[in-house]
Amino acid sequence: MRLVTTREASRLTGLSTYKLREWASRRALIPADVPPKSQGSPARYSWQTILLLRIAVTLRDRFHLELQAHRQVLTGLHTSLRTTSFVSLWGKSLVIDPDQCWSWIDDADFDAVKGDAILIRLSPHLDALSQDFALPRPSRMPGQLDLFPARPIAGPPSPTPASIQSAPHQSHRGRKSAGGRRE
């Protein structure tokens, strides 16, 4: 399983490294999968923990919830995500009711929610994670998964045929002068 460092987790969640450390260590809301070995070394996070952190950021920023009051929900989600496959979460939403009970529902089943609840669509979060963790995305064909998830490749761009043709052609031979001699 691929784990990312605190710096990458900060980028993926939108949390500052200070806030991420506070949530993972000091307040112990969502602990890192691998705590730092020593002071100055980074903690490591799995896709499940990053997804949970993204959900927590959404609850805090969009719904203005105090996360300490919803610690039980976060703990239950963390436990559930440990045994849930990434692929099975596509097309699902998280539902949290006022009694702090939560469930995964299909995006098409919003009518099944009775009463008041907070709904968080998972697809935008999974989309971001699938790129950074090289996890599979849903296939356009039902029941078909990507054999090898595409990973971004970093490096200098290769020259295009147009840029090669537009480069001036340089000859290593001298030009002939009017008298037939090479210059």
Where are these regions (language model features)?
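An amphipathic alpha-helix/helix-turn recognition signal
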Residues: 4-5, 51, 65
